[in-house]
Structure formats: structure tokens, C-alpha cells
Amino acid sequence: MKRQTIFCLFGLLVATVVFWANACHCSAVIIIGSAAGNTGTPLDAGLASRWNQVGDWGSYLGTPIAPNYFLTAKHIGGAVGQSITFPDDNSSYQTVATFQDPNSDLALWQISGAFPSSRIVPMYAGNVVAGVPLTIFGRGLPRTNTVVTGANWPNGTEAKGWLWGTAASARSWGTNTLDGLGDGGAAGTQLAYDFDAAGGSNEGILSIGDSGGPVFIYQSGAWGLAGINYAVGPLAVRQTIDGPTLTAALYDYGGLYLETGSPVSWQLVSATMANKPAVSYSTFLSPRSDWIEAVITVPEPATLLLLTAAFLATPLLHRRAQVSRCRRCLPRSFTQFTHSHDPRPSVAESKSMPALHRQ
């Protein structure tokens, strides 16, 4: 994981696709070491506990943070009346209301009844610094063993990453190291971490379907919930300007062509001595702790009924995957993609990302 002070990012894709029914069981969080991924329970005892505490929300994940609430990503949607389930004992809890954060991509869901205390995951408290280790859970697409190649520096060609696989549903995990924080605009402050070829066999990157999964940071002897998976990019590349468009997990997109401009064109990203890895983003929870606390500590029955009725009046999720388009090089920024029920991609304004510094 490179801990560079400044990134030049080329846009990103919201890590979302709806798999609410009949998804096959494949690997999820993509890792360097194997196309099979880490689909078994982590060996670390604390992470093994978190593995069982996190529930399946459709074909995504949800994390209980209070007796009556679990947290996930807002953009994946859902419907009141659906249930979160826990594979370790097949327990299930029906949702009765949802609360969506107006200032981030977070959504809290209220359940009927209560989670046992053993299900509730503690929140990470405080700030973060570049270099802190992360553990990521998700249920996204796997990678394949098919290598993407591009121009090497100063000459020749070299491997750049792997093509994505197809269907996914099984949860898996990976590790990474925080590079810094990104300004996601309406999506909130984002934990940013890249896909480093030298990061070790468990080095992880998000893929479509990992949205809503948790990110943990070790604090005071326990793994605290620090983030909720949001996005990753760049993804769509070409090996030649007229070649097929590929979707890949990239530890170096230098020497490949990225989509840019309107009308669409493909631009070669110069190969350099240093790799240019894709970056994953997870919504950082600490800046939204006041909103979270306000929701989970004020269960007003009248307000609950109004919120439930309002949500049921909106269209339900069941939308097709949105496919990102990399619009242009945005130094020290990233492109925020809108979330609509229209399956065609749409791009919102670019939001400034501050320089990322070690502390």
C-alpha cells in the first residue's frame, strides 16, 4: 500500500449492483494473493467474532451497531419489511424503518425486536492517520486469473492487474492500509486506500457488490467499525486504444487507456517508474457520529411511523447495476457518481480531495 501524499485520481465507480435473488456463491473482496479470495472466517479471534456479527442484507452486508439498528450504505437501497439474516445461526430480523443520512452515503435500518448484545459491533472512535491497518468485509465480484497488461516504464509491457469475474454473493475479507481521507461531497468523508502490488497476499480492493460492507480498525484491544464501503476506481480500461473495454482490479493503470471526455475518448495514461493503483473508498463514520447517535437514541413512535410511510411511498431498489465512465483526469479530486434507478450512468460534479498527509 503506497502512502503517497497526493493522488491523481481518474474518477470512480460506485461499488454497487443488486443481487437480491439467486446469486451464485463466489469470492468477494478481491485480494492480491488468489482469485479464490478469503472466504473463510479470519484467523484473528477478534475478526472472527466480527465475521459472525455482520449480517446479510439482501446480497450485501449490514452491521448491527445498537440493539435495534444496523448500518449499511445508502445507495444500495432496500425496502422496509425485508430482513437482515445471520448465517452462523440462521437468525433473521425484519426491518420496520430506515433513516438515511442527508450528508453521507450511510443508512441506518431499524428492526423489529432487538439484536442480542453479542451481535452489536463497537464503533471506532476518533480520528485516523495514514498508515493505519484496515480489514474489509464484502460480498462483491471476484477477480479472475486473467491478467491485464499494459505499457511498462521505460519500455516493454507488464502485468497491471486482473479482470473481474462475474456473479458473487459469498462474503470474504481483505486487508489494506489507509492512505488518507477524501472529500466525497454528498457521500461524506471517505477512507481512501489503494491496491498495492507489494501489499501482501491479503491486500484487498473493492468490487461491485462490496458496497455496504464494514471496514474495521483496531483500537483499545478490539476491532472497531470505522467505515462502510462506498466506491472504487478506476475500473474500465483498454489495453490498446481500439481494443475491448475491460473491467479490472488494477494495481497499476499506468500504461493503459482510460475513458475520458465527452464525447467519449480513450486516453493513454503514461507508464511511470511508480505504480498508479486503483483506489477504494469507504465512508468514514467518525464525522457522522452525531447523526448516528441522534437516530439510535431517539426512537419516537410518531416519527417512526411517518418515516416508514414516506419510505414505502418511494420506488423500491431492484435496479440494475450502474456502469461508471471515467470522464477526465481530476488531480486531487474524484468524481462522485449519482445513484438513480436509471441503469444508465450519470455523473455529478467533481468534489475536491485534500492532499493526503502522514501524521
Each predicted region: which residue ranges?
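Cysteine-centered motifs
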Residues: 8, 24, 326-329
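Catalytic-histidine neighborhood of serine endopeptidases
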Residues: 66-67, 71-104, 114, 129, ...
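C-terminal membrane-anchoring or membrane-association module
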Residues: 315-332
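C-terminal subregion of chymotrypsin/trypsin-like serine protease catalytic domains
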Residues: 27-54, 58-77, 168-173, 204-297
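Sec/Tat signal peptide C-region and signal peptidase I cleavage site
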Residues: 19-27
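A short, hydrophobic C-terminal helix/tail in secreted or cell-surface proteins
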Residues: 300-318
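Bacterial N-terminal signal peptides
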Residues: 10-20
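Chymotrypsin/trypsin-fold serine protease catalytic domain
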Residues: 112-205, 209, 229-247
